[in-house]
């Protein structure tokens, strides 16, 4: 993924993947994802997903309705979003101990 191209769009590669996931999930399931759906797909912790949602909202890339579950909406055209990388092709974070 080209970091420079994504930054011109106003989001990082990681943010782009979350935006692509929200868009794709909504198309496939007919409703926006819950944070739990993003936790499972990206294999990250609840605080990680929550912080990403807050940062996407603060950047004006998504909107949410306070107190309404599954109300995330992507505010960009599909053509501005990157292709979603399949779950199995995503790198898994591990901790490496150096000796």
What residue ranges belong to the model's regions?
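Short, cationic-aromatic polyanion-contact patches
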Residues: 11-15, 34, 65-88
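A short alpha-helical element within helix-turn-helix/winged-helix DNA-binding domains
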Residues: 32-42
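Glycine-centered, phosphate/nucleic-acid-interacting loop/turn motifs that mediate DNA/RNA or nucleotide
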Residues: 60
């Amino acid at each position: 993924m080209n970091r420079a191209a994504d930054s011109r769009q106003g989001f990082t590669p990681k943010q782009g993947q979350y935006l692509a996931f929200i868009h794709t999930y909504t198309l496939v399931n007919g409703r926006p994802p819950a944070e739990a759906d993003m936790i499972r797909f990206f294999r990250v912790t609840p605080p990680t997903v929550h912080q990403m949602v807050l940062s996407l909202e603060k950047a004006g890339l998504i909107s949410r309705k306070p107190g309404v579950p599954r109300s995330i909406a992507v505010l960009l055209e599909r053509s501005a979003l990157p292709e979603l990388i399949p779950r199995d092709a995503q790198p898994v974070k591990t901790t490496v101990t150096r000796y």
